């Protein structure tokens, strides 16, 4: 049984981790921390977990966390990097759901996140936790940088085309929408019901923090730099993410439906829909699935890929558990096999 700790358990990502780990057949929650709610029982703050999690929140303590086999950080950016070196030194493995170890260029990270990195020597070691791309590196990792939600949806959508060299790496466009939970659980006027309901807006069009992460991931697949326009949008739903991806084909690309089906045939968490289908966010709610559809634009050399995930599950906590499974040699689907919640 894997002894697990969670640092930062009161945000939406943290409670999603709790939900998944509570029923995981090979993991046992040992420590769950929160500076603001130390001493409060988990099921008092989250009644949905009554009978599932019997722990109380505690102050972060390196000694208690180091007694775990693995620690998840579901914390604001800049938090994990303060504690990770001590945990790794004591043979505790780490999955960071924040952005502290995602970008391999430390100067780029500092520019986008507005702080100096506390342990730049560990950045190169961290495995980027997109299993469909980096499965073998994750298996042997001490430290995994869990991808962001947008980079997951976008990366899985473009992966087959870029691997095969079938699209131009200039002029890529990603138009994405996310539910309000992507903005976090902290009070924020911009995500109040009366502000979000019956509305639709773009944000971060002049530079979202996930942009350099998406570029880095796509460049790894393409074998060189990519030119990308990325525009995220906020929609009035709680959870879910939809990415509409556009690229220019290079010559005769063949049967794209077959390409996608073959690339993801053995991937337990990627579902390529039948030709002509359109993926819906409601069909992945609460699951670790990414559902994809690919098609050519009529009378054009453009290809369109549609990608949906649950931003809290495959876009965060579910993918983190998937990475844990790989790190400890467990079945990759352990604890992640529940179907979507409908309606």
From Swiss-Prot:
InterPro entries: AGPR_type-1 (IPR000706), NAD(P)-bd_dom_sf (IPR036291), NAGSA_dehydrogenase (IPR050085), Semialdehyde_DH_NAD-bd (IPR000534)
Gene Ontology molecular function: N-acetyl-gamma-glutamyl-phosphate reductase activity; NAD binding; NADP+ binding
EC main group: oxidoreductase
Protein name listed in UniProt: N-acetyl-gamma-glutamyl-phosphate reductase
UniProt-listed Enzyme Commission number(s): 1.2.1.38
Gene Ontology biological process terms from the UniProt entry: L-arginine biosynthetic process
Family designation: Belongs to the NAGSA dehydrogenase family. Type 1 subfamily.
Pathway(s) annotated for this protein in UniProt: Amino-acid biosynthesis; L-arginine biosynthesis; N(2)-acetyl-L-ornithine from L-glutamate: step 3/4
GO CC annotations on file: cytoplasm
Catalytic activity: N-acetyl-L-glutamate 5-semialdehyde + phosphate + NADP(+) = N-acetyl-L-glutamyl 5-phosphate + NADPH + H(+)
Catalytic residues (positions): 149
Key word Endoplasmic reticulum present: no
One matching Pfam family: Semialdhyde_dhC_1
Species whose genome carries this gene: Alkalilimnicola ehrlichii (strain ATCC BAA-1101 / DSM 17681 / MLHE-1)
UniProt keyword annotation of Ligase present: no
């Amino acid at each position: 049984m894997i002894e697990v700790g969670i640092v930062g358990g009161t945000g939406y990502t943290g409670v999603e981790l709790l939900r998944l780990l509570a029923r995981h057949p090979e993991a046992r929650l040992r420590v769950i921390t929160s500076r603001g709610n130390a001493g409060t029982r988990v099921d008092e703050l989250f009644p949905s977990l009554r009978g599932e999690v019997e722990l109380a929140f505690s102050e972060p303590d390196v000694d208690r966390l180091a007694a775990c086999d693995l620690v998840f950080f579901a914390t604001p950016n800049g938090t994990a990097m303060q504690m990770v070196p001590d945990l790794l030194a004591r043979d505790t493995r780490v999955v960071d759901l924040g952005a502290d170890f995602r970008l391999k260029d430390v100067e780029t990270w500092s520019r986008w996140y507005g702080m100096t990195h506390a342990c730049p020597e560990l950045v190169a070691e961290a495995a980027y936790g997109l299993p469909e791309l980096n499965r073998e590196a994750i298996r042997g990792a001490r430290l995994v940088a869990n991808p962001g939600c947008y980079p997951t949806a976008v990366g899985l959508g473009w992966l087959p085309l870029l691997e095969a060299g079938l699209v131009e790496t200039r002029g890529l466009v990603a138009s994405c929408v996310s539910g309000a939970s992507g903005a976090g659980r902290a009070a924020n006027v911009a995500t109040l019901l009366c502000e979000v309901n019956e509305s639709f807006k773009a944000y971060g069009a002049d530079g979202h923090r996930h942009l350099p992460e998406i570029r880095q991931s796509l460049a790894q697949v393409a074998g060189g730099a990519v030119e990308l326009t990325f525009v995220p949008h906020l929609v009035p739903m709680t959870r879910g993410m939809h990415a509409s991806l556009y690229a220019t084909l290079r010559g005769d690309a063949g049967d794209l439906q077959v390409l996608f089906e073959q690339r993801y045939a053995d991937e337990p968490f990627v579902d390529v829909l039948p030709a002509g289908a359109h993926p819906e966010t409601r069909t992945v709610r609460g699951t670790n699935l990414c559902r994809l559809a690919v098609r050519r634009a009529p009378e054009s050399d453009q290809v369109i890929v549609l990608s949906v995930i649950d931003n809290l599950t495959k876009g965060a906590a579910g993918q983190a558990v998937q990475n844990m499974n790989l790190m400890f040699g467990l079945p990759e689907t352990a604890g992640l096999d529940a179907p979507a919640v409908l309606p």
